[in-house]
Amino acid sequence: MSHSRHRAEAPPLQREDSGTFSLGKMITAKPGKTPIQVLHEYGTKTKNIPVYECERSDVQVHVPTFTFRVTVGDITCTGEGTSKKLAKHRAAEAAINILKANASICFAVPDPLMPDPSKQPKNQLNPIGSLQELAIHHGWRLPEYTLSQEGGPAHKREYTTICRLESFMETGKGASKKQAKRNAAEKFLAKFSNISPENHISLTNVVGHSLGCTWHSLRNSPGEKINLLKRSLLSLPNTDYIQLLSEIAKEQGFSITYLDIEELSANGQYQCLAELSTSPITVCHGSGISCGNAQSDAAHNALQYLKIIAERK
C-alpha cells in the first residue's frame, strides 16, 4: 500500500548531452534496478537526493507493519510493508510513478532482496527477528535463548532450546540448534498473536512487571525498606544482609538469584554472584570461607550498590 502527495511537477531528467532523458526510459534501460536504486539515481542527477523517514512501526503481531515516507524535491510519498526495506521500496515506487511522464510502470520485487513475509511459507519467516522487534517495541529485555538438551543418534540429532522473555518461557525442538531456536520464538509469537488488541496493555504490564524496579523508581520510592537502606551504615556486626536484601527485593518488586561459582578464588575462598532482576540487571560478586559466607558477602555488596544508586539525585 502506498500514498502520495504531488506538490509540484518535477523537472525532466537532463542528460549531459543534448535533449532530455525521461525517468521511464531510465527504468526501461535498467530493468534490473529496484525503485530505491532508480529513485536515488534520479535524485543524484537532478540534485534532489531522496530522503526516507520511518513514520510508523507496528510490531505488536507476528507480521510487523512499517510505514516509510520519501521526499524527493517537491514530491512526498509513503509506502507500507512488512519490513522496513519493503516499505521504502513501495514509497520509492509511488514517487517514481508520479515523477515519470509515461504510463504507470510496475516493479517486480526480487525475492532474495525483499521477501514479503505475508506471501512466504511459515517455515521461511524469521520468528527470531520478529520476536526481537516485538521486545524492542515494548521496551522489554531482549529474548534469551539457552540450549537445554541435545540428544539422539548422530544421523538424527534433536536439540531443545529454551527461550525466555521477561517472566515468560517457551521451549522449542528441532533437528538443528537454529531450528530449535526458531521454533521457540514461533511459540512466543503465536502466544502474542492470539491475544486481542484490548489486552495488549495488560499483557505489557504482566510481561514488563520485572521492569518495575529501575534506578529512577529506587531513587523516588517511598518504600520503608529502601529508605531505611539509605540511612543504614551497612557495617554493623551481625547484620543479616541476605534477609535485608530479600526484604528490599520484595518491596521494590525484583527477584534475587544466587549463583555459586565452582572455582575457588586466588586466595582459596568460595565465590558467589548475586543477580538482581532490576532494570538494568545488577550482578554483584561475593567471597568467603564458605558458600554461605560468599552469598552473604554478595548480598552485602549488592546492598551497598543499591544504596549508592538510591541516594543519587
UniProtKB/Swiss-Prot annotation:
GO terms for cellular component: cytoplasm; nucleus; perinuclear region of cytoplasm; RISC complex; RISC-loading complex. Residues 1-103, 102-195, 195-313 are annotated as: Sufficient for self-association and interaction with TARBP2. Homodimer. Interacts with EIF2AK2/PKR through its DRBM domains. Interacts with DICER1, AGO2 and TARBP2. Also able to interact with dsRNA. Interacts with UBC9. Forms a complex with UBC9 and p53/TP53. Interacts with DUS2L (via DRBM domain). Residues 1-20 are annotated as: Disordered. The keyword Membrane does not apply. It comes from the Eukaryota. Self-association may occur via interactions between DRBM domains as follows: DRBM 1/DRBM 1, DRBM 1/DRBM 2, DRBM 2/DRBM 2 or DRBM 3/DRBM3. The modification Phosphoserine is found at S18, S167, S246, S287. GO terms for biological process: antiviral innate immune response; cellular response to oxidative stress; ear development; middle ear morphogenesis; miRNA processing; outer ear morphogenesis; positive regulation of cell population proliferation; positive regulation of intrinsic apoptotic signaling pathway. Activates EIF2AK2/PKR in the absence of double-stranded RNA (dsRNA), leading to phosphorylation of EIF2S1/EFI2-alpha and inhibition of translation and induction of apoptosis. Required for siRNA production by DICER1 and for subsequent siRNA-mediated post-transcriptional gene silencing. Does not seem to be required for processing of pre-miRNA to miRNA by DICER1. Promotes UBC9-p53/TP53 association, sumoylation and phosphorylation of p53/TP53 at 'Lys-386' at 'Ser-392' respectively and enhances its activity in a EIF2AK2/PKR-dependent manner. One of its GO terms (molecular function) is protein kinase binding. Phosphorylated at Ser-246 in unstressed cells and at Ser-287 in stressed cells. Phosphorylation at Ser-246 appears to be a prerequisite for subsequent phosphorylation at Ser-287. Phosphorylation at Ser-246 and Ser-287 are necessary for activation of EIF2AK2/PKR under conditions of stress. Residues 34-101, 126-194, 240-308 form the DRBM domain. Belongs to the PRKRA family. It is found in: Cytoplasm, Perinuclear region; Cytoplasm. The keyword RNA-binding applies. Keywords: Cytoplasm, Phosphoprotein, Repeat, RNA-binding, RNA-mediated gene silencing. This is Interferon-inducible double-stranded RNA-dependent protein kinase activator A.
